[in-house]
Amino acid sequence: MADTIPHNTFDTILVLDFGSQYTHLITRRLREINVYSEMLPCTQKLADLGWKPKGIILSGGPYSVYEEGAPHADPAFFELGVPILGICYGLQELAHRLHADNVVAGTAREYGHADLKATKFGGHVDKLFENIEGDMTVWMSHGDKLRNLPEGFHTIGTTQNSEYAAIAHKSDPIYGIQFHPEVTHTPQGGQLLKNFAVGICGAEQKWTMAEFIGQEIQRIRSLVGPDGQVLGAVSGGVDSTVAAKLMTEAIGDRFHAVLVDNGCMRLNECEKVQEVLQEQLGINLTVVDAGEQFLAGLKGVHDPEQKRKFIGGKFIDVFEDEARKIEAKSNGKVEWFLQGTLYPDVIESISFKGPSQTIKTHHNVGGIAERLMRGHGLKLIEPLRELFKDEVRELGRQLGISPELVGRHPFPGPGIAIRVLGEVTREKVEMARQADHIFISMIREAGIYDEIGQAYAALDPSRAVGVMGDKRVYANIILLRAISTKDFMTATPYPFSYEFLSKVSTRIVNEVAGVCRVCYDYTSKPPGTIEME
């Protein structure tokens, strides 16, 4: 894998993940203040890292440090000589490694808001709470606590229920806090993280998309060389469009974008994508109509994982054929495959989960690229791999992509196929497609499209009884899904008004043949995922 990434250029804060649902927020908060941060599982060995961070943050986690099998960081990280901040479980990890009796189960769990009182001692100890005046409202979420103050530390913060809510080493830049500065429930948490990253670690605030573009273009040119050809899939979504435009800026027409019509696209999608990518953005694009192949292969397939695997495999078949055609008419061999993987995709793949199982195969990570690399000898290039969604949108703006396209909701690679529950047929896809068009059109007309992270209509073919035209009908169910999110790692349902949903439901039932009922999915992520399958 092409693996020259920003930690080789930008000062980087390493976040070691112990399994907290909030860990990715630490990385996001740091990047928001233009400090590059990277998250790795707590099982990471320093010897395998290959680069030196400016500082280390130990995340929270659901475990008890004193229990057998609890995760612990590689001791070598503590000998690296860089500042360390332990958050919640991370604080307990710092204390426990100094003495096993320092951490015990609390007599009362502490969840929610608390008021923290800071204590000043002078010198580096006070830097963590610099520019934070008075009591600090913090968010607690822990059951265990420190029984003893570790030897060599000061207590620099207390709450009503936490005697050691914040600690700092007397001589070394090592800090621990029992609360979560990364969540919005800790209003001044961003300032605290800035104090650590910038004030204590000395990280330069140079992480911007303007800086990233120039360096990434040079990286791409160096990897691909003066004659190399790159093949990439595009869908018209933000991620693939931004990745394609970046590649075009780097190597021009030696980048070959391929849009595969799998028969499961949105209404008039291929025509719109072709117009935008070719005419507006100058991207070298080929459109392949493979709808019949996909729909024929999906016949009789009900299992979501099998659907994903078939779609991924069929995409490879199409790409391999297209690569041969491109090679035949170009001056160089196609050696590279572009994939629009984002950092949340990577995080979901590498987060520390203990013995947990894979929820579902992610359509942007793994299979497709692996088969291309193994079977066709292509090398993988992922220019967006280290970016969050908001960073990709900003990158798109920097590249001159229109605000409408940059702000477009995500669309999955398998398309409507994973928005039709169970077996996929042309008729079912068309029902979901028409309902989705109505739903999205009405959202745009209401002026709330940009408030929503993602929205779509899906089809549940279980069917329900209804009455239409004074007759009993037995027809399909449309499921509406719309979420609010900043990073797609967590999400909440968008709070539409009853009147709006009623109007959407009326239009769908009246205008989409074969549908008699419309439901709104009010599930957050977690426990639900954003897509249905």
Swiss-Prot record:
Pfam families according to UniProt: GATase, GMP_synt_C, NAD_synthase
Please state every residue range assigned to the domain named GMPS ATP-PPase: 207-408
Places the protein is found: Cytoplasm, Cytosol
GO function terms (MF aspect): ATP binding; GMP synthase (glutamine-hydrolyzing) activity; GMP synthase activity
Q: Where is the active site?
A: 88, 180, 182
List cellular component terms (GO). cytosol
Q: Which UniProt keyword terms apply here?
A: ATP-binding, Cytoplasm, Glutamine amidotransferase, GMP biosynthesis, Ligase, Magnesium, Nucleotide-binding, Purine biosynthesis
The keyword RNA-binding is annotated on this UniProt entry: no
Q: In which domain of life is the source organism classified? A: Eukaryota
Give all residue intervals belonging to the Glutamine amidotransferase type-1 domain: 12-206
Q: Which cofactor does it need?
A: Mg(2+)
Principal place of residence: cytoplasm
What Gene3D superfamilies has UniProt attached to this entry? 3.30.300.10, 3.40.50.880, HUPs
The Enzyme Commission number assigned here is 6.3.5.2
Q: Per UniProt, where does XMP bind?
A: 308, 470, 525, 531
Q: Which reaction does it catalyse?
A: XMP + L-glutamine + ATP + H2O = GMP + L-glutamate + AMP + diphosphate + 2 H(+)
Ligase is among the record's keywords: yes
Q: Which PROSITE patterns match?
A: GATASE_TYPE_1, GMPS_ATP_PPASE
Q: Which CDD domains match?
A: GATase1_GMP_Synthase, GMP_synthase_C
Its job: Catalyzes the conversion of xanthine monophosphate (XMP) to GMP in the presence of glutamine and ATP through an adenyl-XMP intermediate.
Q: How does it assemble?
A: Homodimer.
Classification via HAMAP family: GMP_synthase
Q: What is this protein called?
A: GMP synthase [glutamine-hydrolyzing]
Gene name tied to this protein? gua1
